[in-house]
């Protein structure tokens, strides 16, 4: 049986990446620091995924195990030494923390003489995520390890898309996911091109697909949350049931479409259909997706290269409309949740400093015209 090592045994890891790896005939070693999840994986050796649609069918994922990377790093290194593929489903801010362990695993492959090509895919929505991870891993590699990695270890970037809402079940491994999923991998950085996963798309140039996903799904989802919160909606479905909110989301996606078509020459009709499907996904009645989950960490989401400011900057450069995105940014600055540290911090910043200074600090913008435009909506 083929072997995989997957970092991050959370809902996305189990409910999306784990399902695909299982369907491709892999044994999966989940690596995490959550003892409860790791213990359950080792005790049961399987878990269930429920598809959030009519009939609510279930998939049983078997041939799984767990390794606590904090308590048993040597087991992770051993698993990396013999694995056929490595994937991650952890946040960009966590990637540097697994770099040293990955480097030790790569060194172990070198020492063991394992020259089977291996690809490492960071499956979180970050432009250049796998390459970012590689830069972190390189810090811990010996000169011999660097040469070995350059020859045998690939870090192809990936784009992933599946809505997995926050959830809690008696069975800690059980996870509910939406029917839709998309996983795209760039081919130009693959070291093992013969290992092709079914239900995964492979593209020479990944950037158009990452931007299509980030600017459409992530921007649209966050728009639903921030406007929804303003109007008192508790879930994304509730927000979409308000015709006014739905219309505003569609207006934001129309601006995103104009950017994607101008920048990447996407087919207009295909992109319209893609955005129609996104709205339908947000309206899934079998998913309870809390506004608070989607809206959390507004400071991060208002960043210079994030889902709002980046498309706004690029639309402005192209002299295309971004008025509806600006309105959404205003709602994001106004968002408050007592359980979200960033939203509270944002409120504190706005109370102590001028709105303009806070906009500059949070967005990283130096375009005075654009800064002033954002200030008008806060």
Curated annotation (Swiss-Prot):
Gene3D superfamilies: N-(1-d-carboxylethyl)-l-norvaline Dehydrogenase, domain 2, NAD(P)-binding Rossmann-like Domain. The keyword NAD applies. It is an enzyme of class 1 (oxidoreductase). InterPro entries: 6-PGluconate_DH-like_C_sf (IPR008927), 6PGD_dom2 (IPR013328), Mannitol_1_phos_5_DH (IPR023028), Mannitol_DH (IPR000669), Mannitol_DH_C (IPR013118), Mannitol_DH_CS (IPR023027), Mannitol_DH_N (IPR013131), NAD(P)-bd_dom_sf (IPR036291). Keywords: NAD, Oxidoreductase. GO terms for molecular function: mannitol-1-phosphate 5-dehydrogenase activity. One of its GO terms (cellular component) is cytosol. GO terms for biological process: mannitol catabolic process. It holds the Pfam family Mannitol_dh_C. NAD(+) binds at residues 4-15. It comes from the Bacteria. It catalyses: D-mannitol 1-phosphate + NAD(+) = beta-D-fructose 6-phosphate + NADH + H(+). PROSITE patterns: MANNITOL_DHGENASE. Its EC number is 1.1.1.17. HAMAP family: Mannitol_dehydrog. Belongs to the mannitol dehydrogenase family. This is Mannitol-1-phosphate 5-dehydrogenase. It comes from Streptococcus pneumoniae (strain 70585).
């Amino acid at each position: 049986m083929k072997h995989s090592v997957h970092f991050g045994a959370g809902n996305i890891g189990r409910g999306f990446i784990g399902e695909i790896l299982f369907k491709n005939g892999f044994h999966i070693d989940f690596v995490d620091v959550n003892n409860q999840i790791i213990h359950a994986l080792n005790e049961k050796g399987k878990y269930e995924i429920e598809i959030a649609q009519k009939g609510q069918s279930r998939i049983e994922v078997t041939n799984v195990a767990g390794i606590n990377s904090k308590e048993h790093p040597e087991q992770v290194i051993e698993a990396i030494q013999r694995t056929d593929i490595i994937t991650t489903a952890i946040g960009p801010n966590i990637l540097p923390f697994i770099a040293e362990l990955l480097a030790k695993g790569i060194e172990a492959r070198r020492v063991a003489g394992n020259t089977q090509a291996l690809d490492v895919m960071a499956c979180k929505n970050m432009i250049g995520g796998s390459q970012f991870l590689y830069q972190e891993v390189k810090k811990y590699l010996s000169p011999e390890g660097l040469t070995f990695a350059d020859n045998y270890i690939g870090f192809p970037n990936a784009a992933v898309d599946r809505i997995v809402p926050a959830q809690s079940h008696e069975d800690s491994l059980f996870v509910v996911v939406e029917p839709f999923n998309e996983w795209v991998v760039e081919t130009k950085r693959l070291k093992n091109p013969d290992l092709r996963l079914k239900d995964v798309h492979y593209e020479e140039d990944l950037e158009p697909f990452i931007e299509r996903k980030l600017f459409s799904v992530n921007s649209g989802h966050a728009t639903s949350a921030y406007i929804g919160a303003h109007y008192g909606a508790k879930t994304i479905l509730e927000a979409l049931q308000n015709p006014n909110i739905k219309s505003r989301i569609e207006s934001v996606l129309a601006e995103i479409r104009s950017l994607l078509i101008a920048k990447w020459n996407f087919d207009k009709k295909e992109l319209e259909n893609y955005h129609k499907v996104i709205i339908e996904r947000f309206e899934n009645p079998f998913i309870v997706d809390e506004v608070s989950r989607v809206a959390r960490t507004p400071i991060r989401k208002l960043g210079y290269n994030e889902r709002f400011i980046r498309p706004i900057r690029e639309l402005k450069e192209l002299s295309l409309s971004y008025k509806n995105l600006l309105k959404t940014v205003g709602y994001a600055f106004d968002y408050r949740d007592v359980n979200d540290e960033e939203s509270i911090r944002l409120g504190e910043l706005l109370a102590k400093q001028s709105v303009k200074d806070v906009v500059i600090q949070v967005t990283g913008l130096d375009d005075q015209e654009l800064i002033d435009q954002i200030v008008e909506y806060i």
